Amino acid sequence: GGSEMCIRDRYKRERLMSQYRKILMQIQARLPETKIYVMSYYPVNRELPGADPEAVKAQFGARTNAELKEVNAEVEKMAEELNCTYINVFDCLLDEKGNLKAEYTIEGMHMYANGYAVVLEKLMPYLLEE
C-alpha cells in the first residue's frame, strides 16, 4: 500500500483501495468474530532542510500529505462500511506546516523511535480494550 505510492507510475489509488477492501473482506470471511482495527497512513515530510527536490520527488513518488489525507479519508470510510475501527494517527504526527514532524523522521518518510512512541500512545486505548 504505502510503498506502492513511492512508485509514481505504478500507483493507482483505486487499485490500492480495491486491494485493501479485498484483504479486509477476506479476514472477515475467514475470521468473522475478529475485531479489525485499521490505522491511517503516516504523514511524510518532503521539506526537510537540505533535501534535494529531485531526490525527494524520486524517493517519495506520489506519496504527498495531500494524497495521504485523501487516502486516509477513503480508508476511514471503508472501515466504517465494513464495521472496522479506524484509528487516526496521521494528525498526531504533524507539525505546524502539516508535515511529519522533523524530529520524528530519518529522511522524511521513516520514523525514529520517538515517532513510533507517539503512535503507540495513540494505539494504547485500543490495545487495552477487552
Regions found by a protein language model. Name each.
Residues K12-R21:
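Charged helix-capping and loop-helix junction motifs
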Residues G1-I7:
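Short, small-residue-biased leader/transition segments that mark boundaries at the very start
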Residues D9-Y11, G108:
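Acidic/histidine-rich helix-loop elements
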Residues Y20-M25, N72:
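Generic structural signal for well-ordered alpha-helices
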Residues L31-K35:
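A short helix->loop->beta-strand "cap" motif at the edges of active sites that frequently abuts
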Residues V44-E130:
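Catalytic His-Asp segment of secreted/periplasmic serine-dependent ester chemistry enzymes
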Residues V38-S40:
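Structural beta-sheet core signal
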Residues L24-A29, A79:
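N-terminal cationic-hydrophobic initiation segments that often serve targeting/anchoring roles
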